[in-house]
Amino acid sequence: MISTVQDSLEGHFHVLTPIKLNLALHIVGQRTDGYHLLESLVYFSLSGDCLSYAPCERDRFILTGPFAKGLSCNSINLAVRARDFMHKTFPRSAKPSSFQLMKTLPVASGIGGGSGDAASILNILRQKWKLDCSCEELAEMSLALGADVPMCLFALEYQQPLFVKGIGNDVTRLEEACSIAMVLVNHGQKIATETIFNALEKRNHPPLKINPVALKTVSSLVEVLQETRNDLFIPALKIAPQLAEVLSTLDESGSLFSRMSGSGATCFGIFKDQQAAQKAAAFIKSMHPNWFVKSIITLGRSSQ
């Protein structure tokens, strides 16, 4: 399933790509090839970048939007690599495509923007080319594009939060997890994921223990999160001390629980409902007009 925003013309449509949020992230080891082993509670919102697709005679990729500056339309861009990956993997089914990506999410911000874009392109082409390939099969193959791409594919397919282990390839769907209202805040400093992982002083932290039953309501979820961590926060804070101000601002705006997502620098706050989240987002934006602030609703069951 894809989050379809518009289907105005045959074959032409727009989707909003997934935002990935690590509500908890425990680093529990490291493989000999350098990949870190993690355990993470991951939620998603289909309110990210805007991706437009249309069939065409020759491949085309266009970048626009407030966060497109400095990005390229070549193989350095993960979204372009995803398109090229599909051409190489399914040459007999491949057809030219035109993609326009409006970047509305900060780059290098710990919310999987690039991975969500890539997963959306994989998912679109799987459907448009009518491939005899399941989401699970494509997710396994797409690990070559990055550890976050498979989980974003699963988010598009199943519309549920996930418990993720290993290097991102061991995924469990959390079917009972409720949808939550959140506010995302980014103060503007880019943080390279590799830099944060290299700065880790310890790579064998205690595992993440989550009882799926506790994810059914916002209040019980918040209680569970109090006993979890983001093991990347301490090294990120040393690089970007402004993170402390962001988290403090979220708390002041009424957040029930605030934390940095992934390797940063985006932080999130959990709120009791959408109205509270929207009110908090407006408050934070008025106080810090240069910050990225976004109110979202995550995928999941209704908690009502």
UniProtKB/Swiss-Prot annotation:
It comes from the Bacteria. Keywords: ATP-binding, Isoprene biosynthesis, Kinase, Nucleotide-binding, Transferase. InterPro entries: GHMP_kinase_C_dom, GHMP_kinase_C_sf, GHMP_kinase_N_dom, IspE, Ribosomal_Su5_D2-typ_SF, Ribsml_uS5_D2-typ_fold_subgr. Pfam families: GHMP_kinases_C, GHMP_kinases_N. One of its GO terms (molecular function) is 4-(cytidine 5'-diphospho)-2-C-methyl-D-erythritol kinase activity. Pathway: Isoprenoid biosynthesis; isopentenyl diphosphate biosynthesis via DXP pathway; isopentenyl diphosphate from 1-deoxy-D-xylulose 5-phosphate: step 3/6. It catalyses: 4-CDP-2-C-methyl-D-erythritol + ATP = 4-CDP-2-C-methyl-D-erythritol 2-phosphate + ADP + H(+). Its EC number is 2.7.1.148. The keyword Transport does not apply. HAMAP family: IspE (MF_00061). This is 4-diphosphocytidyl-2-C-methyl-D-erythritol kinase. The gene is ispE.
